[in-house]
């Protein structure tokens, strides 16, 4: 057996002696933080949703055995340490002492076992753990996982969307496969749920008995030593960009996400505000319906790619602000050094009108209409789709842009209802496993795509290979992505967000605002 004590796992992270000695979590205690968000969570039950809005809330309320740090590396959270067998088929976790739930009960291994078993049964993320045979309690501080086959278990256990949230065992028993609601939304996080009024607000209050992880000298990623400085954090759904801008300026909001780039010059001139660029943030891409009679033909897909000038698309999406986009072909962002790859890059950013004509002729295409669905909820998506449609139409591809609201677009895409191209964006994936739903045969977001070479490459990268071999296997996957085009990646879009200068200690993060270790100094 291989022991993974915290000293080994955390040696290069923010541990005692590794962070500045003068670090102080809170400049002041108390106050309230009002955060303007683009949308509201669909549920407070952390294991039931993969949406960004649900994840943004879950990380305040719940914790897992392990999580990701600032550098996309797995770190312990509720786990004190773990042991992995030599064959990779057994993991034994020892839990931290004295962890309290929001209802005052102390966490034990039974809570972990019950929560994980429920996740494996009802969560849309359960597919990450198809090779988990069992999870069982050994003693009050020890949990054992037995695997059917070796796979990147820790990486998948740390993924926060949906998170493998730990609930009290009695709550799990009460709800089973039903949605946990109301006062039973109980976790171990630094904030607890006050109230949720769908489409109005999510209110969270400081959990006074939160057990800070003293192995760290400060927060990192989704974990580390987290401290609730503000008494209350409120997430307010404000879908209108103009309303988020106005509220930030007037002080109704202390924070606003996804600000329109067109408002940035005005906001940057306001000394009461601080505007940040969230980088990385989104990969702009289009998904393809591989059941469509034209999109299903590889020469047609290659023609779509050969007609694209990504620089022009990204300029349109960012209103010409070069600091808000990046032309690059990797599915993982350059900041994610473990997975960044330029495999297949020769197919990217190589527009050629003659090549497009040859490929369309090979596909037998004669100007038949192709429905391209998009939305205006995300201005960068809309601008990108307009520019893409113009490039394709100029190249002789008869795309018909169809506008709808974002929820309707998602529903139509999932129902595979009369469309060929779907404008979308991907937030940062933390592990190759998170790409399976878009690349693997039979998965919901692959939209009919199936390639046996891809199946083999995906199986390899999602096996229990050492990290360096997994990286090589991932490069094979990306090579096939660019050779076969299950999706078409355009480039990176970075997003502006803003805070009032009365918020002290706030640090932007690529998937969600983090208001732990943030002080509200407004009187």
Where does each model-flagged region fall?
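Periplasmic binding protein-like
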Residues: 35, 104, 384, 390-441, ...
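Periplasmic-binding protein-like
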Residues: 295-336, 383-384, 481-491
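N-terminal lobe/hinge region of extracytoplasmic solute-binding protein
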Residues: 36-86, 111, 117, 498
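Aromatic-rich, solvent-exposed beta-strand/loop patch
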Residues: 102, 146-165, 185-243, 264-282, ...
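Structural transition elements
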Residues: 191, 323-362, 378-383
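Extracytoplasmic/peripheral linker and loop segments enriched in polar/acidic and small residues
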Residues: 347-349, 398-409, 417, 435-501, ...
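Surface-exposed binding/hinge segments that line
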Residues: 23, 28, 94, 127-173, ...
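Aromatic- and charge-enriched surface segment that lines or borders ligand/interaction sites
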Residues: 80-125, 138, 144-146, 247, ...
